[in-house]
């Protein structure tokens, strides 16, 4: 647990357990300072990154509302 590695996430997958284990697959211009394991997306131009961390706790809100 601790600080969530992302403030919000559109492509989030979480387990149904309590607390949930969540991953965020959003493509980012850069990972947040809270992200411990930041992976570069291969062949991305401009460069994009995914935070590889697994967060245990309350799922993050979505960054963008899907209309």
From Swiss-Prot:
Entry-linked SMART domains: BowB
Any Gene Ontology CC annotation: extracellular region
Cystine pairs: 8-63, 9-24, 14-22, 31-38, 35-51
Protein name per the record: Bowman-Birk type major trypsin inhibitor
Family membership noted in the UniProt record: Belongs to the Bowman-Birk serine protease inhibitor family.
PANTHER family: BOWMAN-BIRK TYPE BRAN TRYPSIN INHIBITOR
GO molecular function, one term: serine-type endopeptidase inhibitor activity
Site (Reactive bond for trypsin): 16-17
Keyword tags: Disulfide bond, Protease inhibitor, Serine protease inhibitor
The organism of origin for this protein: Setaria italica
A Pfam family matched in the record: Bowman-Birk_leg
UniProt-listed InterPro entries: Bowman-Birk_prot_inh, Prot_inh_BBI
């Amino acid at each position: 647990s601790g600080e969530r590695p992302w403030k919000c996430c559109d492509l989030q997958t979480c387990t149904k357990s309590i607390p949930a284990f969540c991953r965020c697959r959003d493509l980012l211009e850069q990972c947040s300072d809270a992200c411990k394991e930041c992976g570069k997306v291969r062949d991305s131009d401009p460069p994009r990154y995914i935070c590889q961390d697994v967060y245990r706790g309350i799922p993050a809100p979505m960054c963008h509302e899907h209309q």
